[in-house]
């Protein structure tokens, strides 16, 4: 906040407003868990496993196979973002400035220029960091390649059984010309010509497109494809107050507070795809098992490998352990290990898995 308060002599009473950007994430996520955060900071959700399909045996006691207790995993969401702002509008200053600082108007300005951008940028960063599918591109998208990259993203999601509806493509603003001028965009999208004429981005291959200011897109990400059911962003408190002549102040005191957070739903993480710059995604670990001992390795120098043996996804699980070559995990016969690589400044790898046979 600037420190100057300009008292009017012969100035216009009109305030020059700045450009701003409406929220681009508000309709991008599921609200299925919002009510679960009422009255609590932490919510835990179950992921229930399934049983294997066996060959039926027509004799003996366990004809359907050997019964095993159905297992489950627990994923934890902890709401940590608690932000506030405050400012005053002194009655004397207001009188000497043509009352240009109206509390209601200034609060709306605060929301659109400070609060909304902060929440949008935070959400996108969290969702990108937790993306279930992260692919590093060999080069930045161009007019000749961007269409194929988007189709590849679609195919990767399809192969993970992500529903084909409720997907949204978030594209860096600087990449819009490459997409709008690509031959695939004109040929495949019936709204292509209209979009070019009006300057409004519509759909590409059936996917709604939203462009994002380059500075809002997570670092080293070209575009994100998000399925609505894969991301959540609960808002526990969204409170704004205007106090008139509170104790100690002749004028108005404006206060605001938001308690919120953003998460990727672990069991649906494949519904978030990011296309990144080259070398910005950790390589998927390799797993080798000998004498019931698991050896994990990653081709990404300096990466940390997280692993689980309870069936949960190591990228999101509270039971994940950090791998050390000095203390390799020991597996029972038939036990499965899952591993993923993480590193600061890079996006997480895919999950590798292997069963001790």
Give the ranges of each region predicted by the language model.
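Structured, hydrophobic secondary-structure cores that serve as assembly/anchoring elements
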Residues: 44, 50, 65-67, 73-99, ...
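Short helix/loop capping segments that flank catalytic or ligand/cofactor-binding pockets
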Residues: 53-56, 178-181, 263
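Glycine/small-residue-rich hydrophobic helix-like segments
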Residues: 200-248
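N-terminal "assembly arms/tails" that initiate or stabilize quaternary assembly
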Residues: 1-77, 270
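Alpha-helical scaffold segments that mediate packing/assembly in large oligomeric complexes
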Residues: 94-160, 276-278, 357
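Short, compositionally stereotyped local motifs that mark structural "simplifiers"
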Residues: 277-357
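Extended, solvent-exposed, turn-rich assembly/linker loops in the middle of proteins
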Residues: 129-200
